[in-house]
Structures are given as structure tokens and as C-alpha cells.
Amino acid sequence: ANKFKNSACSLAVITVKDGQIIKKAYSLIKPPFMSFDDECIEIHGIQPKDVLHEKTFDQLWNAIYENHLKGNIMVAHNAKFDMNVLRATLDYYKIPWPELDYACTVKLSRAVWPDLVNHKLNTMAAYIGVEFKHHYALDDAETCAKVVLEAAKLKGVNSLPDLLKATGVPLEPFIDDKNRSAQDALHKEPEPEQMSFF
């Protein structure tokens, strides 16, 4: 919605199993503060009135995690950005970070199709023949999944771990040593002498 990373106003998740898309989830999100930057509205087309009566992220998270993310590898295009948005939003609602791994389809696209003019999601969609509405979260997520499936087909592998191994693209932890201490501090119970009473 705005420049703050915890201001996501929509989310989408696509679940892939055995090379097939088996589940989809999409929702608008009411962000913590109803402040929308014009530049952001121009990108995704979502306005404050669209999310006024939608659920907040914390009301959606458990279902998304249990039904789509738990036990799976997350994949996103320019994943570092999406992971930072997810971390910031989890932090805002004081939700512990999940123990998950993720991979980036920008890195994957560069490894599999190095000669393309660029590896933006709309470029990849056009290259693999997928029509989609850019910056509409569900289409973005589905296109991302199809990039992975096309790359796996090209490399002759049947799983994401095998694809990453074949291309040298890293599988990255959502919680690494660098950010684990900050996450632990956020959720640590205060010692008795640190407690304040009002």
C-alpha cells in the first residue's frame, strides 16, 4: 500500500505437487494503516476502499501457512523483496517466523535462460507463453509457478530440489543466522525485572 514493508494489501499462494498446480489462494488484505501511496495504487490498482472491510494479515496467516506453506518450499520472483515484506508483516503482528526455505525465480530464470534481455516476470511470462495481469498477486504467483515448471521440464527433473541442484540456484532459509537473533529478541518473554505495570 505504501513504502513500509508491512503494508501488503494483497496476497496469493499457488501450491504445486507432482508438476501440477493443485491449490490456489488469493485475498485482499487490510493493511495496518490505511495510507496508500499513489505510486503503489498505480502499480497494483488496489485502493483503500477495496480493502476497507477485508481481513488483516494476522487473520489470514494461519490458514495460508497450514494449507499452503507448511512443509513446502516457498518460491517467489525477486524473492528477497517478498521475504522482507513477509518478515516485516509477521513482526508487526508479533507472529513467529516459520522455519521454511525459499528459492528465487529471478535467479532460476537467469540460470536457465541466460540470454534473455532481462528476467522480469512479464518478460518470463511472454517467453514461456503465459498471459497474465502483472502485479495482480494471483497471476504473479501462478506465473512464477509456471516458470519453475517450465524450467524443470527443460532440465529434465521432477522436483524443485533437483531443479535447484541442476541450476546451482540456492535454497535459502527464511530464518538465517543473521536475522534469527532479531527474531528471538522480538518474541522473547521479558524477565520479571523488565516488566512494566500500568
Mark where each language-model region is:
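Buried hydrophobic packing segments
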Residues: L86, L108, C144-V148
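Conserved non-catalytic scaffold segment of RNase H-like nuclease domains
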Residues: A1-E99, P114, H119-H135
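Ser/Thr-centric signal marking residues that sit
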Residues: S27, T105, C144
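Acidic two-metal-ion nuclease catalytic site recognized across multiple nuclease folds
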Residues: L149-F198
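Acidic, divalent-metal-coordinating active-site segment for phosphoryl/phosphodiester hydrolysis
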Residues: A137-A151
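Acidic active-site catalytic centers that drive phospho-/nucleotidyl reactions
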Residues: N78, D82, C104, D140
